[in-house]
């Protein structure tokens, strides 16, 4: 059993720890959480509790196919991280660098069209309506000097 154990497994261009359970190891890939990882493994027919180091090459290939197009493999559209993409209108699940690039493009689009959210991003202020009087302060604090008596 130990002869086919791998300490590091490469899935979707990312090295994952072979000593962890597969569902937790997949969360090391940016864009994949524990719930989505469990869904992918259930669709692939892989035990989520087995160690990632015991995955075969066929199982890794199956996981990568599902990650490439999860909706086509039966994962519901509400579980993906990019439903109804702005440019294509498709339900997609982005991982690794593609996720970072898409997020950056979304913020830049909001800045370009001068949307309220884009302006808040530019100014480095909270975007989702939080209060700013006491939180989101930057820099060092300036104390109040006491008046001489």
Curated annotation (Swiss-Prot):
GO biological process entries: translation
CC terms in the record's Gene Ontology section: cytosol; small ribosomal subunit
PROSITE patterns: RIBOSOMAL_S13_1, RIBOSOMAL_S13_2
Keywords annotated in UniProt: Ribonucleoprotein, Ribosomal protein, RNA-binding, rRNA-binding
Alphabetical list of Pfam families matching this protein: Ribosomal_S13
GO molecular function term, any single one: rRNA binding
InterPro entries: Rbsml_uS13_C, Ribosomal_uS13, Ribosomal_uS13-like_H2TH, Ribosomal_uS13_archaeal, Ribosomal_uS13_CS
Gene3D superfamilies to which the protein is assigned, alphabetical: 1.10.8.50, 30s ribosomal protein s13, domain 2
Keyword Transmembrane annotated: no
Family: Belongs to the universal ribosomal protein uS13 family.
Subunit structure, as described in the record: Part of the 30S ribosomal subunit. Forms a loose heterodimer with protein S19. Forms two bridges to the 50S subunit in the 70S ribosome.
Function, as annotated: Located at the top of the head of the 30S subunit, it contacts several helices of the 16S rRNA. In the 70S ribosome it contacts the 23S rRNA (bridge B1a) and protein L5 of the 50S subunit (bridge B1b), connecting the 2 subunits; these bridges are implicated in subunit movement.
PANTHER family referenced in this protein's UniProt entry, alphabetically: 30S RIBOSOMAL PROTEIN S13/40S RIBOSOMAL PROTEIN S18, SMALL RIBOSOMAL SUBUNIT PROTEIN US13
NCBIfam families: PRK04053.1, uS13_arch
Protein name (record): Small ribosomal subunit protein uS13
Taxonomic lineage of the native organism: Archaea, Methanobacteriati, Methanobacteriota, Thermococci, Thermococcales
